[in-house]
Swiss-Prot record:
Keyword Membrane attributed: no
Protein name (database record): Large ribosomal subunit protein bL20
Family: Belongs to the bacterial ribosomal protein bL20 family.
A biological process from GO: translation
Gene: rplT
GO cellular component, one term: ribonucleoprotein complex
Keywords, alphabetical: Ribonucleoprotein, Ribosomal protein, RNA-binding, rRNA-binding
Domain of life, per lineage: Bacteria
Function: Binds directly to 23S ribosomal RNA and is necessary for the in vitro assembly process of the 50S ribosomal subunit. It is not involved in the protein synthesizing functions of that subunit.
Gene Ontology terms, MF aspect: rRNA binding; structural constituent of ribosome
InterPro entries cross-referenced by the UniProt entry: Ribosomal_bL20, RIBOSOMAL_L20_CS, Ribosomal_protein_bL20_C
Pfam family, one: Ribosomal_L20
Length: 119
């Protein structure tokens, strides 16, 4: 059985890792041993932050809805309760978008909520 030389496969593996490390600063971007560790750590951060992103955006939407609702005389929790009572099924992402870009539409939703809360 012939001896296996690793020239081609090693070069391909190194190229793959260094391509993933493109744009990294210093030796993290051009020394294989360090780049390999940096790429692995970057993958861990990416995995973790794909999950964190969902929580962060939800917090942002709630903060925006709360700010817009308070301008119109309701707290976020009162507003959320009123939405449920008025059976308005608009998600937080859409409500936050309305609160930022279409104040009139958000205001009309708040009026419906206030009417249900008063009743």
């Amino acid at each position: 059985m012939p001896r296996v030389k690793r020239g081609v496969t090693a070069r391909a593996r190194h190229k793959k890792v260094l391509a993933l490390a493109k744009g990294f600063r210093g030796r993290r971007g051009n020394v294989f041993r360090i780049a390999k560790q940096a790429v692995m750590k970057a993958g861990q951060y990416a995995y973790r932050d794909r999950r964190t992103k969902k929580r962060v955006f939800r917090q942002l939407w709630i903060a925006r809805i709360n700010a817009a609702a308070r301008e119109l005389g309701l707290t976020y929790s009162q507003f959320a309760n009123g939405l449920k009572k008025a059976s308005i099924e608009v998600d937080r992402k859409m409500l936050a978008d309305l609160a930022v870009h279409d104040k009139a539409a958000f205001g009309s939703i708040v009026e419906q909520v206030k009417a249900k809360l008063a009743a």
